C-alpha cells in the first residue's frame, strides 16, 4: 500500500465541476492499493500518515505530525501509484489491486484516519481534478 503525502496549505478535489472534498492546512494523501495489500497494511500506513512528523514546530524544525499541527486530511484514491514503470514507455498496472479490494481498503483507510482528525475524500474510481498548494514543497512517498 502506497501513500504519496504532500504537506499543503489548502487542497481540494472536484468531480464533474463540483468540489466534493476540501481542506485547509494538512496533508493531501494520494493512496494506491496493490494486489497484496490487506487491512494490516492499511492500519500500518494510516498510523504512519497520522504520525509522520513533517510539520514545523516553534523552532521551525519538522517535528510535528498532522494531528499535533491541528491539520486535516484529504484522501484521494490513485491507482496509478501502483504502476510498474520499469519496462518500456507505458506503465503496467498488473501490481494494482482489483477494484473491489482497492475500494474496500480505501474506505477502511479513511475510517482509520477519520477517528483521529477531520478527513475529506475524493470519489473512488472517478475522474477527479485535484488542486493544492504544496507547503514547502514537502512531499513523501510512504510504502508499507
Swiss-Prot record:
As recorded in UniProt, its EC number(s) are 3.1.1.96
Q: Which terms does the UniProt entry file under GO BP?
A: D-amino acid catabolic process
Where's the motif Gly-cisPro motif, important for rejection of L-amino acids? 136-137
A Pfam family this chain is assigned to = Tyr_Deacylase
Would you name any one GO CC term? cytoplasm
Question: Where is it predominantly found?
Answer: cytoplasm
User: Which InterPro entries does this chain map to?
Assistant: Daa-tRNA_deacyls_DTD, DTD-like_sf
Provide the protein's localization: Cytoplasm
The record's domain comment reads: A Gly-cisPro motif from one monomer fits into the active site of the other monomer to allow specific chiral rejection of L-amino acids.
Q: Which PANTHER family match?
A: D-AMINOACYL-TRNA DEACYLASE 1 (PTHR10472:SF5), D-TYROSYL-TRNA TYR DEACYLASE (PTHR10472)
Q: Which NCBIfam families match?
A: D-aminoacyl-tRNA deacylase (TIGR00256)
Give the multimer and partner information. Answer: Homodimer.
What protein family is recorded? Belongs to the DTD family.
What's the name of the protein? Answer: D-aminoacyl-tRNA deacylase
> What organism is recorded for this protein?
Haemophilus influenzae (strain PittEE)
Amino acid at each position: 500500500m502506497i501513500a504519496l503525502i504532500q504537506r499543503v496549505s489548502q487542497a481540494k478535489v472536484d468531480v464533474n465541476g463540483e468540489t466534493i472534498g476540501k481542506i485547509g492546512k494538512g496533508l493531501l494523501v494520494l493512496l494506491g492499493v496493490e494486489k497484496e495489500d490487506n487491512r494490516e497494511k492499511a492500519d500500518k500506513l494510516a498510523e504512519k500518515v497520522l504520525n509522520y512528523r513533517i510539520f514545523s514546530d516553534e523552532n521551525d524544525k519538522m517535528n510535528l505530525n498532522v494531528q499535533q499541527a491541528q491539520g486535516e486530511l484529504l484522501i484521494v484514491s490513485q491507482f496509478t501509484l501502483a504502476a510498474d514503470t520499469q519496462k518500456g514507455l507505458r506503465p503496467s498496472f498488473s501490481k494494482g489491486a482489483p477494484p473491489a479490494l482497492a475500494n474496500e481498503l480505501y474506505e477502511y483507510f479513511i475510517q482509520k484516519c477519520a477517528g483521529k482528525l477531520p478527513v475529506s475524500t475524493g470519489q473512488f474510481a472517478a475522474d477527479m481534478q485535484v488542486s493544492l498548494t504544496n507547503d514547502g514543497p514537502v512531499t513523501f512517498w510512504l510504502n508499507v
